[in-house]
Design a protein with these regions (language model features):
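Active-site diphosphate/adenylate-binding microenvironment
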Residues: 2, 6, 16-66, 72-77, ...
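Short, charged/polar micro-motifs that form catalytic or ligand-binding hotspots
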Residues: 12, 75, 79, 110
Length: 220
């Protein structure tokens, strides 16, 4: 058993013991830590529960993140420790990209500034605060300004990350097709109700063509 599997099983036991909603679900499916010796046996709580129940191990929340609620009801993620959440996404970022200080980070997130409880907005705001400051920031629907910033960064060969919701990235690269050599594109989902739904491979091909890159990264 590797370290990841051991940690996963320990977390399953912790959630079972301290999370009343999750424990009830496991009991109803006749699964307990005594029955589980592999990560593939750990029960997955249906995501709809985050719309209908308070899913948490703690009685007090440091913050509550909410989904977009495109279907009418928002899902709620009760966070007991913001520092733990920050440690998680910062470590994930540095593992794949290095330090945010090494990049210009541009965020194309129309609609998110009006949603202060969005975890994506929280993460991007934190990373942007640590990034190089000249062009880093939120561009919302400012396609012309974003286009000029990307051109300037490409001309200076500056390492850049453009992170954005799917429909906005697609709208942008259709209006401003580019050939980017120093920019990483990260899509975060978010096509529902805004444009025709595409399978991931088809969507990524459109972004690759529009931005002139060989890979598209994802963050969900």
């Amino acid at each position: 058993m590797n370290e990841f599997e051991k940690e996963s099983l320990d977390l399953f036991s912790y959630q079972y013991e301290r999370n009343p909603v999750y424990r009830s679900f496991c009991d109803l499916t006749n699964v307990s830590p005594l029955d589980v010796d592999s990560i593939i046996q750990i029960p997955f709580l249906p995501v709809t529960f985050f719309k209908t129940h308070r899913v948490s191990c703690k009685k007090e929340d440091a913050f509550i993140f909410e989904s977009s609620g495109t279907a009418g009801t928002t899902s709620k993620h009760h966070v007991a420790s913001l520092s733990q959440y920050e440690h998680s996404f910062r470590k994930g970022f540095t593992q794949f990209y290095g330090q945010p200080e090494n990049y210009h980070i541009l965020a194309l997130l129309p609609g998110y500034i009006e949603r202060p409880n969005a975890s994506l907005l929280y993460m991007c705001r934190d990373l942007i605060s640590k990034a190089k400051i000249e062009f880093s920031g939120f561009y919302l629907n400012q396609f012309e300004e974003l286009h000029k910033a990307l051109i300037a960064l490409e001309e200076q060969q500056k390492p850049t990350i453009l992170i954005g919701v799917s429909f906005a990235l697609l709208d942008f690269c259709e209006q401003h097709p580019m050939q980017l050599q120093h920019t990483i594109i990260i899509e975060t989902g978010g096509m529902k109700g805004r444009r025709k739904e595409l399978i991931r491979e088809e969507f990524h091909q459109l972004l690759k063509k529009g931005f002139g890159v060989s890979n598209i990264h994802s963050e969900y």
